[in-house]
Amino acid sequence: MTRKLNFMGAINEALDQAMEKDENVILLGEDIAGGRDVGHLEEQNEDAWGGVFGVTKGLGPKHGLDRVIDTPLSEMGYMGASVGMAATGLRPVPELMFNDFIGFAFDSLLGQASKMRYMFGGKATIPMTVRTCHGAGASAAAQHSGSYYGIIGSIPGIKVVVPATAYDAKGLLLASIEDNNTVVYFEDKTLYGLKGEVPEEYYTIEIGKANVVREGSDLTIVTIGKMLYVALEVAETLEKDGVSVEVIDLRTVAPWDEETVLESVKKTHRLIVIDEANPHNNVATDIASVVGQKAFDYLDGPIRTICAPNTPTPFAVSLEALYLPNAEKVLTEAAELIDDLKVKA
C-alpha cells in the first residue's frame, strides 16, 4: 500500500524499518537523538530535534540510546568509530550534518573504509552507510551548500547514492544499509519537503540502476538529484515545439548506469548532462567522457554539460538562483543541439 510521504519522512521510515529488521543497524550523529532538552537525554524526550533537519526525530524514543547515539561535535571521531563498528559486525549509519564537513572525516573514507575489503582479500567488509545533506538553493552560503558526491564517487571501494524522489529516498537508503560495502548517501536538503507516493512496506531499489523518468527520441537529458525537476520542466517546454526529450535520473553516481545512458544516446543522438556540482572533475564530465568514447558515432552534436560555476556557492538569494543550473540555461544548450528548435531560449 502506498501513500503520500515527503522526502524526509521517507528517509525516517527507511531508518526505522532497517532498525526493526536488523538489530545491528546503529545510528550516530550530532544531535540526532537530542538537540533539544539535552539535560534529559536519557528520557529521549519526544520533542528532541532528531538532527539539524529533524530527519531522525522519534527514532531515539523508539529504539533507545544504545542504537541512536548522540556524538560529540567531531566528525573525525564518530566516523572513525563507525568504521570500527562496521569492521566488527555492526551496520552503522552515521549522519554527517553537511557534506561540506566531509574533510574532517576524509581519512575514515579514503584511508580506511574504501580500502579494507581490498587489503584483506575480500574477507573484510565495511557495511557503513554515511548519510549527509548537500545542495544549493536554501541560501545556506558557501560552507553549507556544496555538492561533493563527485569527489567521493571518485574513490574506489565506495558507492554513492543521490536520490531525487521520496520513493527513491526510501528504497535506495534501505538498499544502502543492506549493502556490504560503504555507501555515502546524499540527501538534498531542498527536497526534504517534497512529497511523493511511497509504499508502507520495506523495499529496496538496486544501487547502480538509473531511472528513465520520461521516454523520448530527440534528446537525452541525464540528471543528478534535484536537477531531475529542471530536466522535466525543459522536457515539457520542448514537447510543445515537437521535440521529444528522454529524461534519465541517475540515482547513483558511483557506480553510474552506463548501459542505460548509452542506450538512450544511441536512440536520441544528443546528450545534455545537468549536474549542480562545480564544472571540473565532476560526474557530468565523467559521463561525457564515457559517452564520447563509447557512443561517439551515434552523436549528432557535441555533448553538453550544464553545471554550477567554478566558484563557491553565493549566499545572496538572487546570486544563488543564477548560480544553479536552470531551465533557461538548459533550453539555450538544447536550442544549439536541435536545429529546428522553436523555443525562445
What does each of the following model-derived ranges do?
Residues 1-182, 189-190, 194-345:
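Thiamine diphosphate
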Residues 185:
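Non-catalytic, usually N-terminal nucleic-acid engagement modules in DNA/RNA processing proteins
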